[in-house]
């Protein structure tokens, strides 16, 4: 029985590369001279440090195109609130969402069941396994999910015949 997986993954080495390039651009910009503006990468979080909300906004405008050029979908970022960290320094955390969250997975499974396509969908951890009788039905399921779920980056892989 043919099947495929719906998942959401981020290429972490490409993300690190994008952060490094953004930091080089930030350190070379005139309007950031003398400030402690930088982007730090944690396990699944990016932290922007700056002197003002304007600087943090400018750093986002540098970082996001770098991520796009490295083929990282920026919809995987969840923006945190601006936080004061002593003096006139600010930070903002950008959480990198990896894996399909449970509520989104349930929404996708419900979407596939309500579509009357002859497919079975099962949540398997941070991925969704979709199986059907024919490859054509699976392709229709992919098209349906791509059309309906636009606010979160999804990848379709692990095809089996």
Swiss-Prot record:
InterPro entries (UniProt xref): DUF520, UPF0234-like_C, UPF0234_N, YajQ-like_sf
Keywords: Nucleotide-binding
GO molecular function (one): nucleotide binding
Origin superkingdom: Bacteria
One Pfam short name: DUF520
GO cellular component: a single term: cytosol
PANTHER family cross-referenced by the UniProt entry: UPF0234 PROTEIN YAJQ
HAMAP family linked: YajQ
Entry's family note: Belongs to the YajQ family.
NCBIfam families: PRK05412.1 (NF003819)
Biological function: Nucleotide-binding protein.
Protein name per UniProt: Nucleotide-binding protein AZOSEA28950
């Amino acid at each position: 029985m043919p099947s495929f997986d719906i998942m959401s993954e981020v290429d972490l080495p490409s993300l690190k590369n994008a952060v490094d390039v953004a930091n080089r651009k930030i350190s070379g910009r005139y309007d950031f001279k003398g400030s402690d503006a930088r982007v730090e990468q944690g396990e699944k979080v990016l932290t922007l440090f700056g002197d003002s909300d304007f600087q943090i906004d400018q750093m986002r405008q540098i970082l996001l195109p770098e991520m796009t050029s490295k083929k990282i979908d920026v919809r995987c970022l969840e923006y945190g609130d601006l936080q004061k960290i002593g003096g006139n320094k600010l930070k903002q955390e950008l959480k990198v969402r990896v894996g399909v969250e449970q509520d989104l997975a349930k929404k996708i499974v419900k979407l596939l069941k309500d579509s009357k396509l002859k497919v079975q969908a099962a949540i398997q951890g941070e991925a969704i396994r979709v199986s059907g009788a024919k490859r054509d039905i699976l392709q229709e399921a992919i098209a349906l999910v791509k059309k309906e779920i636009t606010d979160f980056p999804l990848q379709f892989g692990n095809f089996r015949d």
